[in-house]
Amino acid sequence: MQQLTEIVEQALVIIDQASDLKALDDIRVDYLGKKGKITDMMKMMGSLSPEEKPAFGQAVNDAKQAIQQKLTERIDGLKSAELEAKLIAEKIDVTLPGRTIDIGGLHPVTRTIERIETFFGELGFSVKQGPEIEDDFHNFDALNISEHHPARADHDTFYFNPKLMLRTQTSGVQIRTMETEKPPLRIISPGRVYRNDYDQTHTPMFHQVEGLLVDENVNFAELKGVLHDFLRNFFEEDLQVRFRPSYFPFTEPSAEVDVMGKNGKWLEVLGCGMVHPNVLRSVGIDPEKYSGFAFGMGVERLTMLRYGVNDLRAFFENDLRFLKQFK
């Protein structure tokens, strides 16, 4: 028994002196392992009398528990000290501002298109899409644009061959819709269009939204009402709006629409008119029964006016300093 007591006392001292977890694990093996000192003491049971064995066995178990308890306490203490040292080394100043997440935003042109689609969607207009590579029938002929019209010139239009080109307006979508669907029709057709022009207010590629309504007894007063409401909704103010007589091959009568700018000058924002009877005939719609109105607007121009941008080219230069202003 004296030897067992000495082993326990020795183990407890060594455990207190251990400086790391590796040393504690070595102590555990030396005293409690299969070949450890406490395990060796159990082998002495064979030399004891039956009367002595119970007391000796109990003493060995108590010794094992004492050593194991001390090991557990010392391990917990070292782990706690290790964690505290780590936390001190990695101390965080909680008063510092957090790292912000850079959230993306819609491009201003996309925002404008969505705003237009939302307004006309509430009036029952559906959104239609069409090909950007267009044939001369859908881009010119069906729109009552004569063979010698300036819009067909090489310096205005990007041709692949005499019959195939990049579309110069989204009006071809209206033609394709009227070819496949019967009146009444209410559609808008947003999309990219292409013209051979590049300066402060023009780019070779830009976006248009064109609208078409075909039904019985459609008149110019309805067109004026729709566009007047749209412009007030888009610019979110009660603007002065005027309709100027103009000419477009595909509408008759035709008009250009201006709004009064903050500088006291009229600004052109879109074109419109009653669908020309020849356009209706080209797609098999009887102009004696049906009439309609159409309008078209440059998305970039509307965006420039809404946000006060002076150079249209800024929308396509992908300068984040510019684009982040529209989040």
Curated annotation (Swiss-Prot):
Top-level taxon of the source organism: Bacteria
InterPro entries noted in UniProt: aa-tRNA-synth_II, aa-tRNA-synth_II/BPL/LPL, Phe-tRNA-synth_IIc_asu, Phe-tRNA_ligase_II_N, Phe_tRNA_ligase_alpha1_bac, Phenylalanyl-tRNA_Synthase, tRNA-bd_arm
Catalyzed reaction equations: tRNA(Phe) + L-phenylalanine + ATP = L-phenylalanyl-tRNA(Phe) + AMP + diphosphate + H(+)
Required cofactor(s): Mg(2+)
Documented EC number(s): 6.1.1.20
Location (main, coarse): cytoplasm
Enzyme class: ligase
Subcellular localization: Cytoplasm
Coiled coil location: none
Protein name in UniProt: Phenylalanine--tRNA ligase alpha subunit
